Amino acid sequence: MEEQQNINQEPEVKQVKKKSLGMEIWEWTYSILLAVVIALLIKNFLFSTTIVKGESMLPTLQPNNMLVIDRLSQIRGIMPERGDVITVEAPEATSDEGIAQYSEVNGLFNKLIHSFTKVLYVKRVIGLPGDEIEIEGNELRINGELMKEDYINEPMRYNPYLIDKIKVPEGHVFVMGDNRNNSKDSRYFGVVPFEKIEGEAIFRFWPFNKFGGI
């Protein structure tokens, strides 16, 4: 009889405690903040993406090409090699010594905003620390040697550049666009400090018919 009573007993129903509105808001806020932190870590220490603006890198890169930028080398302090395509923060001016100038950004919040809003240029590394760069007419010489570049499609026309002769100081690079006649680069704003290099452009993922390495 006792066994029959046990069989007929209904299982105990556990009540699930309903989350409060405050708890739900906190969980959503936490998830969003975590996603932002992860995105920032990836962008600043691993990889980022950029969209090519303008025609300064023709014919290598076209306007609206989308690129993957490798941040690891810059984070580890490895200087890029001559010929690398890199992204650099757009300078605001140049000094009398031919060094690109930038405004100082102070405060954690301001630096965070700046990391998302700063303008980037896509350029090719031409000169490394210690190199003597000389531009005369349509000729580019590095350490006295005439450079032959198969990635440009027309000769450089002479313009009265602000900087046509310079020895690249330590910790800096001299950059130029492949479209030499339509590029704002180190000929105008000077050599770029290493810390203003965003990273190396290693991959093009748009458009799909140009999908692949650079």
Across the structure, where does each feature detected by a protein language model lie?
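Soluble "head" domains of membrane/secretory-pathway proteins
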Residues: 2-25, 41, 45, 51, ...
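Hydrophobic membrane-insertion alpha-helices, especially the h-region
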Residues: 29-45
